[in-house]
Amino acid sequence: MTREEFKAIRKRLGFNQAELAELLGYGSAIRVSEFERATNPVAVPRLVAMLMMAMDETGWRPPTQEKE
């Protein structure tokens, strides 16, 4: 998955970088930013790419959690 594909899917899914980072279990949006950055891009892990593509194809979204 290219950085352009990753970013396009993230946007289609309606997530900002921080929201996607939380969903994927990353501590901050920095990792998602690294996946999308033009300079020194970090390879998107295969499992993350598969999850993004599955969510994009099926329209699945994680359930929202009510904040107390």
Regions picked out by a protein language model, each given a short descriptive name:
Residues M1, T64-E68:
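Short intrinsically disordered terminal tails
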Residues M1-R12:
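A short, Lys/Arg-rich alpha-helix, primarily the initiator
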Residues G25-V42:
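Recognition helix of helix-turn-helix/homeodomain-like DNA-binding domains
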